[in-house]
Amino acid sequence: MAKKKSNTEQPTREVVKPIEGEVICVVKKLFGGEHVQVICTDGKERLGRIPGKLKKKVWIREGDVVLAAPWDFQPNKCDIVYRYTESEVRRLVEDKVISQDVIEQLRG
């Protein structure tokens, strides 16, 4: 039987971009459980909560770039919506959603 040709090109997925009410943040510290401390691009430090649908599927470490949705009733807290991979962070920089300087400053 003939061997099938494999498609070496992987389809490029759309990068999740922040919509209204969401900010890009960098994880500063892990508190355990489902809580992290994040520094956001709007200049605020927030206590982030990792919801159950992400907790076991996506492992979040210090220095990761994440998308967060600040709470309306407590602006110093937020929910983590998405974790960006390094290639997705590069795509965000290429699309001028965020600058590389800002990410480096937030990572410390």
Swiss-Prot record:
Molecular functions (GO terms): RNA binding; translation initiation factor activity
Protein keywords: Initiation factor, Protein biosynthesis
PROSITE patterns membership: IF1A, S1_IF1_TYPE
Origin superkingdom: Archaea
Xref: Pfam families: eIF-1a
Domain S1-like residues, every copy: 11-85
Keyword hit for NADP: no
Keyword Endoplasmic reticulum (UniProt): no
CDD domains: S1_IF1A
Summary of the function given for this chain in its UniProt record: Seems to be required for maximal rate of protein biosynthesis. Enhances ribosome dissociation into subunits and stabilizes the binding of the initiator Met-tRNA(I) to 40 S ribosomal subunits.
Assigned protein family: Belongs to the eIF-1A family.
This protein's name: Translation initiation factor 1A
